[in-house]
């Protein structure tokens, strides 16, 4: 499936409506689970999860740099603390070790340079509601899969908002620009109405907006400050061409938030929900 990288404004079917300023309210909403029998296939296949230490504020992409600092410091300490004369072979070994340490330190910067742009860090929106809504008309196994998928997308990427639609049923998680005086059922229906108005259910090609910003944009369910948007359609694995089963949408407050590796990984997550 091809990916369209869009650097032009995206105009959905409904216009941007002015909204009043309000402070951030953080809460979670979820539909009541209907009692259904659980199957043995309830757990999400975690093979798509990426490695992380889980340390708040620690960027694992800079791990080679810290390793280089550590080994380089040990080599220098060993060199200056040696009491015996240093042989020529030891000097060559230390020079090679310092060269490898320097390369390890520079590796994260080289990686960003080769990508062609610097990926910014996400920031939480100043406005918006943090919500968690799952349709009640789906089975417990699919609910668990959707809950895990949205969690790992928020945890392992720069995403601040994720929406998954599977056969018309929704799972919405993260920060969204939604009303704050609605019940759980009303909030779910509100998101479903907005999705129908936007027309994302009819998208058949992967869309990526690395510079989703500006007043001309009108996707008003996203929080203010959204700068990147990625939409992955869920095309059914049938002989019928281009039969869409739903879509996966992620948004970030960082520009160029989703690299080729990120988009491939999100696509692997979407594979879990294809028909």
Curated annotation (Swiss-Prot):
Any one cellular-component term (Gene Ontology): chloroplast
- What's the main place this protein lives? plastid
- Give membrane topology per the record: Multi-pass membrane protein
Residue ranges crossing the lipid bilayer per the database entry: 66-86, 94-114
Lumenal-side stretches of the chain, per the record, are: 87-93
BP GO terms, sorted: cytochrome b6f complex assembly
Record key words, sorted = Chloroplast, Membrane, Plastid, Thylakoid, Transit peptide, Transmembrane, Transmembrane helix
Mark out the transit peptide. 1-19
Subcellular location per UniProt equals: Plastid, Chloroplast thylakoid membrane
Stromal membrane side: 20-65, 115-275
Q: What happens when the gene is disrupted?
A: High chlorophyll fluorescence phenotype due to an impaired photosynthetic electron flow. Seedling lethal when grown on soil. On agar plates supplied with sucrose, seedlings grow very slowly with a chlorotic phenotype. Deficiency in the accumulation of the subunits of the cytochrome b6f complex and lack of covalent heme binding to cytochrome b6.
What InterPro entries does this protein map onto?
CCB2, CCB2/CCB4
Q: Name one Pfam family in it.
A: CCB2_CCB4
What's the stated role of this polypeptide? Answer: Required for the biogenesis and accumulation of native cytochrome b6 in the thylakoid membrane. Controls the conversion of apocytochrome b6 to holocytochrome b6. Required for covalent binding of the c-type heme to cytochrome b6.
Protein name, UniProt field: Protein COFACTOR ASSEMBLY OF COMPLEX C SUBUNIT B CCB2, chloroplastic
Q: What is the lineage of its organism?
A: Eukaryota, Viridiplantae, Streptophyta, Embryophyta, Tracheophyta
């Amino acid at each position: 499936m091809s990916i369209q990288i869009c650097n032009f404004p995206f105009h959905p079917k409904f216009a941007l409506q002015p909204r009043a300023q309000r402070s951030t309210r953080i809460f979670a909403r979820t539909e009541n689970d209907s009692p259904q029998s659980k199957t043995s296939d309830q757990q999400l296949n975690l093979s798509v999860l990426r490695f992380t230490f889980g340390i708040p504020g620690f960027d694992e992409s800079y791990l080679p740099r810290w390793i280089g600092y550590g080994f380089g410091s040990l080599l220098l300490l060993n060199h200056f603390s040696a009491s015996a004369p240093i042989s020529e072979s030891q000097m060559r070994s230390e020079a090679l070790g310092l060269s490898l340490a320097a390369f390890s330190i520079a590796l994260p910067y080289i990686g960003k340079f080769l990508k062609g742009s610097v990926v910014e860090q996400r920031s939480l929106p100043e406005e918006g509601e943090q919500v968690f809504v799952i349709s009640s008309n789906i089975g417990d196994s699919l609910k668990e899969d959707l809950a895990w998928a949205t969690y790992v997308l928020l945890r392992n990427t720069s995403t601040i908002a994720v929406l998954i639609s599977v056969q018309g049923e929704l799972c919405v998680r993260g920060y969204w620009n939604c009303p704050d005086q609605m019940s759980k059922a009303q909030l779910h229906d509100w998101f479903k109405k907005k999705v129908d108005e936007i027309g994302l259910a009819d998208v058949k090609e992967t869309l990526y907006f690395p510079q989703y910003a500006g007043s001309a944009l009108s996707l008003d369910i996203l929080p203010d400050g959204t700068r990147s948007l990625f939409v992955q359609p869920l095309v059914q694995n049938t002989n019928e061409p281009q039969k869409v089963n739903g879509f996966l949408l992620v948004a970030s407050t960082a520009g160029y938030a989703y690299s080729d590796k990120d988009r491939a990984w999100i696509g692997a997550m979407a594979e879990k929900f294809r028909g």
